[in-house]
Structures are given as C-alpha cells and as structure tokens.
Design a protein with these regions (language model features):
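Structured alpha/beta or helical-core interaction and ligand-binding surfaces enriched in interleaved
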Residues: 1-141, 147-165
Length: 165
C-alpha cells in the first residue's frame, strides 16, 4: 500500500464536497437522510462498493488523527489491532501536518471503518459522483445524508445487493 490516505487542502475539500456540516443535528435538519445498520464487516463491504461506484477521484474522508494530542494518540494506539497499528505507522511517517481532509483510498476503508465502528476515532466519508455524506458511527448505524433520491437509491441498491445488513 503506497498511501493510506491522500491529503487535500481545506479549499479543495470545500470545492468538491457539497454535503458538509459541523454537527450531526445540522445534517438531520438540513439534508435528506437515511440510516443503515449492520455489522462492521457489512459496513466495510458497503463502503468499498460505494467507493467503486464513485471512483477514487470522488471519494473523501475526514480523519482527525493529526489533530489529536500525544496522549490521545497513545490511547488510540493501545486500542487498535496489530494490522491497524502498521497502517497507522505508515500514515504517521508520511503526514505530520494538522490536515484532516483526505482523498479516500480503497485500501484505507477497512482501517477507517474499524476505527469508527469500534468507537476509537470517528470519521465522516464523503462521495461526490453520487453525492452523499456518511456520518459514522452511532451504535453500528451510519446516517447517510443526501440531496437527491436517485443518488440515495444507488447506495440502497448496494446495501440490498450485499444481503447481510
């Protein structure tokens, strides 16, 4: 794996991502939404399929590890498995700035999802070809915010095709 996540500027993020908000309540108040529930494995598969649907060029994530203080980083490392520690070490070697916005990579999806579903570090995933924002995680449920019913149908089709939600 070359890059776990690919950093982007706040400016680029705001230009590309139209469904963004500061609090979950803002999302519920200002956007159409549906919630999907399932196992960690189901979410990983769902997000990988959604990534394929949108393409790498239309897939983003906020990942707040770089803004954690040293004590919180240490606690996080104590909570993750060996596989995720290796990924985190690769991330740390490459990214030292306080950036939180990244292009999502397919390889990072299991890592990001495990951190969210295990309530270690929450991330929000943004897709822009079929615009939606997936806020995670609330007791293994992920609210999906969207503008257009045709867009959300793409994601509901993925969920239904996976058959293990």
């Amino acid at each position: 794996m070359n890059e776990i996540l690919i950093p982007i500027s706040n400016k680029e993020f705001k230009e590309k991502v139209t469904i963004r908000f500061n609090s979950i309540n803002d999302g519920f108040n200002n956007y159409n939404n549906k919630t999907i529930e399932g196992t960690e494995e189901a979410f990983i598969s769902f997000l990988q399929e959604a990534f394929e649907l949108n393409g790498a060029e239309n897939s983003y994530v906020d990942f707040y590890y770089n803004v954690l203080n040293d004590e919180d980083k240490k606690k996080l490392k104590e909570l993750i498995n060996d596989e995720d520690k290796i990924l985190l070490e690769k991330f740390e070697k490459n990214y030292h700035e306080k950036n939180i916005y990244f292009k999502l990579t397919k390889e990072s999806i299991p890592f990001i999802t495990r951190l969210s579903t295990r309530e270690i570090l929450f991330s929000t995933i943004y897709f822009t070809k079929y615009p939606c924002t997936i806020w995670g995680n609330y007791n293994k449920s992920f609210p999906i915010f969207y503008h257009d019913n045709n867009d959300i149908q793409q994601y509901l089709n993925i969920k239904n095709e996976l058959q293990f939600f």
